[in-house]
Amino acid sequence: MLIVLFLTLFCSVVFRTAYCDVAIVAPEPNSVYDLSGTSQAVVKVKWMHTDNTPQEKDFVRYTFTLCSGTNAMIEAMATLQTLSASDLTDNEFNAIIENTVGTDGVYFIQVFAQTAIGYTIHYTNRFKLKGMIGTKAANPSMITIAPEAQTRITTGDVGATIDSKSFTVPYNLQTGVVKYAPMQLQPATKVTAKTWKRKYATSEVTYYYTLRNSVDQHTTVTPGWSYIITADSNYATPAPMPADNGGWYNPRKRLSLTARKVNALRHR
């Protein structure tokens, strides 16, 4: 039972751009939780807020939902809890997951964070639950990337969303306090290039000798993948140790010279 909240909230408001960043510091991602000896488990989720806006006081409600499935086919397994922001202390949440919500498999948590003018939806890293006795099937595959986050912040009757064209502007030509990176691509199966060159021959650096009261950039937004990478366990029988299959050798057989005590030779 895990709630691995990896919650990075980006909030954009018409006529006034605002940014928020919630960093999850506990529990650890890619964990395995065994419920064989108990019917439930309590997992402490801890996060921290930055000084950017909307600030911590701007969030009014959090809803945590246990999910399974692929990024394209997310299935809600159980609603864990809905809490007012005032019910949370020290940016911590003790989540309880019952062993009856589904079968053994891979799960993740949807985090719905609500403000007075909108909401954000984020998803945690995936984790495994063992010892489950439910009948609702959970996805068995540990897909490597969490589902894409969604943001909807409104001002009056006007909604503010991220313009997808922002991701096409070269990074070094962007001047706003929020920059947009291109979608991450996977490497090709073969290297065909014969030569290489620097994409950016030079870069800038500014040294400050006193504390600065403002920043040039608040955050970088990266779009989610438009493709899906699936992964699974390696079901092959473990190979024997090298010594068991003749692959091991004594390193002494590779020596062509005999070791000598140099100090002893010098004293002769």
Swiss-Prot record:
Record PTM: O-glycosylated.
Keyword Manganese found: no
Location of the protein in the cell: Secreted, Cell wall
Coiled-coil zones: none
One example of a Gene Ontology biological process annotation: cell wall biogenesis
Domain of life: Eukaryota
GO cellular component terms, A-Z: extracellular region; fungal-type vacuole
Keyword annotations: Cell wall, Cell wall biogenesis/degradation, Glycoprotein, Secreted, Signal
Signal sequence region: 1-20
Alphabetized PANTHER family for the sequence: CELL WALL SYNTHESIS PROTEIN KNH1-RELATED
Family label: Belongs to the KRE9/KNH1 family.
Function: Involved in cell wall beta(1->6) glucan synthesis.
Name recorded for this polypeptide: Cell wall synthesis protein KNH1
Gene source species: Saccharomyces cerevisiae (strain ATCC 204508 / S288c)
Gene: KNH1
